[in-house]
Amino acid sequence: MLKPLGDRVVLKVEEKEQKVGGFVIAGNGQAATKTAEVVAVGQGIRTLNGELVALSVKEGDKVLVENHAGVEVKDGEEAYLLVSEANILAVVE
């Protein structure tokens, strides 16, 4: 499993399928955001005086992330998205 460093977060993006006339269209290239589940989080970032500030998200959170943010990485057969916490727009409740 991937263990992110600093303020980075590993996400599993939810693929949404659209059907048009019985055909499945994978993904939505026009969307500005996508929904993902937080799989792993880094330890946080250090302030100038050395204090560790934890991230605002935790494993299992469902989040809204910018569509073109981060780097896609593979761990075995699974594909994940590695993003900075700043690219996460909101926690979906």
Swiss-Prot record:
Any one GO CC term of the record: cytoplasm
Subcellular location: Cytoplasm
UniProt GO BP: chaperone cofactor-dependent protein refolding
Keywords, sorted A to Z: Chaperone, Cytoplasm
Coiled coil segments of this chain: none
Alphabetical list of PROSITE patterns matching this protein: CHAPERONINS_CPN10 (PS00681)
Keyword Nuclease applies: no
InterPro entries reported for this sequence: Chaperonin_GroES, Chaperonin_GroES_sf, Chaprnonin_Cpn10_CS, GroES-like_sf
N-terminal signal peptide: none
GO molecular function: ATP binding; metal ion binding; protein folding chaperone; protein-folding chaperone binding; unfolded protein binding
Organism domain of life: Bacteria
ATP-binding is among the record's keywords: no
SMART domains documented for this protein: Cpn10
Family statement drawn from the similarity comment of this UniProt entry: Belongs to the GroES chaperonin family.
Subunit structure of this chain's protein: Heptamer of 7 subunits arranged in a ring. Interacts with the chaperonin GroEL.
HAMAP family, sorted: CH10
Chain's role: Together with the chaperonin GroEL, plays an essential role in assisting protein folding. The GroEL-GroES system forms a nano-cage that allows encapsulation of the non-native substrate proteins and provides a physical environment optimized to promote and accelerate protein folding. GroES binds to the apical surface of the GroEL ring, thereby capping the opening of the GroEL channel.
Name listed for the protein in its UniProt record: Co-chaperonin GroES
Lineage start: Bacteria, Bacillati, Bacillota, Bacilli, Lactobacillales
